[in-house]
Curated annotation (Swiss-Prot):
Residues 1-18 form the signal peptide. The beta chain mediates most of the interactions with both subunits of hemoglobin, while the alpha chain forms the homodimeric interface. The keyword Ligase does not apply. It comes from Rattus norvegicus. It comes from the Eukaryota. This is Haptoglobin. The gene is Hp. Residues 31-88 form the Sushi domain. GO terms for biological process: acute-phase response; animal organ regeneration; defense response to bacterium; immune system process; liver development; negative regulation of hydrogen peroxide catabolic process; Notch signaling pathway; response to bacterium. Expressed by the liver and secreted in plasma. Glycans are attached at residues 148, 152.
C-alpha cells in the first residue's frame, strides 16, 4: 500500500502503531508486545485506522477503520476492501493575510500567505504567474503560454519551453499543457505536472468556487512576481488588495472593445483587454497599487469567512494596467470549473 500523504494507525494486540505509507513497513512484529489476555464471551480484534498527514484530508465511503476478516483482508463495513485516499487540502493557508493592505506598490508576502502562487518562466526568460489548483494541476493564461510563440504553436510545442517554480523556488517538471478550446475569448490554459507536489504550508492549492464571489466592491487579493514601480521584475512575491469593479464602468474605460490587443485612443496603455461575459474587472482609481506585466495567471483570491476557505474567484488575464489603466481584467473561475474538472479527469 502506498499513498502520498497517508499514515496508517494499527491496533495490534493492544499496541498502537503509526505507519507512514511508502516506508516499506507493511509487516509489523514486536516481540515485546504481549498478546492481550482473552476474556469470557469475547475476542481480540485487529484494527487499522487510515489517517492523512497535515494538509491532506481523508476521502472514504466509510470511517477509515478497517478490520481483518477471516480471509485475511482488511475491510470496512461501508467501503469493503476499497482503500481511502488522502486528497490535498485547498484554500487553507497556515498564515493567511491578516491585514487590510493595499503589485506595483504592493506589500511583500513574508509569511507565505499565498501558497498557491507559482512562478512561470516562459521562452526567452519572461516571468509570468500560474495558480496551483490541485497537487498536480495549475491554471494560467493562454497568452502566458503563447509568449514568444507563434499562433500556430501547439501545446506540445509550448510545454518544453516553460520553467515552473512553486513554494520557495521549488522547481517542478511539466508533463503537458492543455489550452482552453475557446482561448480567443477565454484566456486560459492548464498545466499538468509530471509528479504530484507534496502539499505543505508553503505549497498548497487554492479552491475553485462553486458559487460566484464576483460582485462590485468585493475585495480580493492578488499576488505576483510581476514588474514593480521601477518596471523591474520583483525578486520577492508581492500582493495587493483590490475591489471588484463595476463592469459597465470598466467596459466604458476600455471603449467597450471586446477585440484583444486593439489600439484605442482612450486606453492609457494602448491595448485593449478581452472583455466579455467570461471576465470581470478589479482595480482602484485613487491608489498606486496595482497588478502589472508578469502578474497574469495569478488568482483573484477571496476569503469565504463562513467556510474559512480561500477561493480563486478569477485568474488575472490583462496585467497591463500597472496603476495607469485603473482596471485589471480577470477570467471568471465559475465559468472554468466544469472544463477544468473534465480536463483533469481525462488526463
Amino acid at each position: 500500500m502506498r499513498a502520498l500523504g497517508a499514515v496508517v494507525t494499527l491496533l495490534l494486540w493492544g499496541q498502537l502503531f503509526a505507519v507512514e505509507l511508502g516506508n516499506d513497513a507493511t509487516d509489523i512484529e514486536d516481540d515485546s508486545c504481549p498478546k492481550p489476555p482473552e476474556i469470557a464471551n469475547g475476542y481480540v480484534e485487529h484494527l487499522v485506522r487510515y489517517r492523512c498527514r497535515q494538509f491532506y484530508k481523508l476521502q472514504t465511503e466509510g470511517d477509515g477503520i478497517y478490520t481483518l476478516n477471516s480471509e485475511k483482508q482488511w475491510v470496512n463495513p461501508a467501503a469493503g476492501d476499497k482503500l481511502p485516499k488522502c486528497e490535498a487540502v485547498c484554500g487553507k493557508p497556515k498564515h493567511p493575510v491578516d491585514q487590510v493592505q493595499r503589485i506595483i506598490g504592493g506589500s511583500m508576502d513574508a509569511k507565505g500567505s499565498f501558497p498557491w502562487q507559482a512562478k512561470m518562466i516562459s521562452r526567452h526568460g519572461l516571468t509570468t504567474g500560474a495558480t496551483l489548483i490541485s497537487d498536480q494541476w495549475l491554471l494560467t493564461t493562454a497568452q502566458n503560454l503563447f509568449l514568444n510563440h507563434s499562433e500556430n504553436a501547439t501545446a506540445k510545442d509550448i510545454a518544453p519551453t516553460l520553467t515552473l517554480y512553486v513554494g520557495k523556488n521549488q522547481l517542478v517538471e511539466i508533463e503537458k499543457v492543455v489550452l482552453h478550446p475557446e482561448r480567443s475569448v477565454v484566456d486560459i490554459g492548464l498545466i499538468k505536472l509530471k509528479q504530484k507536489v507534496l502539499v505543505t504550508e508553503k505549497v498548497m492549492p487554492i479552491c475553485l468556487p462553486s458559487k460566484d464571489y464576483v460582485a462590485p466592491g468585493r475585495m480580493g487579493y492578488v499576488s505576483g512576481w510581476g514588474r514593480n514601480v521601477n518596471f523591474r521584475f520583483t525578486e520577492r512575491l508581492k500582493y495587493v488588495m483590490l475591489p471588484v469593479a463595476d463592469q459597465e464602468k470598466c467596459e466604458l474605460h476600455y471603449e467597450k472593445s471586446t477585440v484583444p490587443e486593439k489600439k484605442g485612443a482612450v486606453s492609457p496603455v494602448g491595448v485593449q483587454p478581452i472583455l466579455n461575459k467570461h471576465t470581470f474587472c478589479a482595480g482602484l482609481t485613487k491608489y498606486e497599487e496595482d497588478t502589472c506585466y508578469g502578474d497574469a495567471g495569478s488568482a483573484f483570491a477571496v476569503h469565504d469567512t463562513e467556510e474559512d476557505t480561500w477561493y480563486a474567484a478569477g485568474i488575472l488575464s490583462f496585467d497591463k494596467s500597472c496603476a495607469v489603466a485603473e482596471y485589471g481584467v480577470y477570467v471568471r473561475a465559475t465559468d472554468l470549473k466544469d472544463w477544468v474538472q473534465e480536463t483533469m479527469a481525462k488526463n
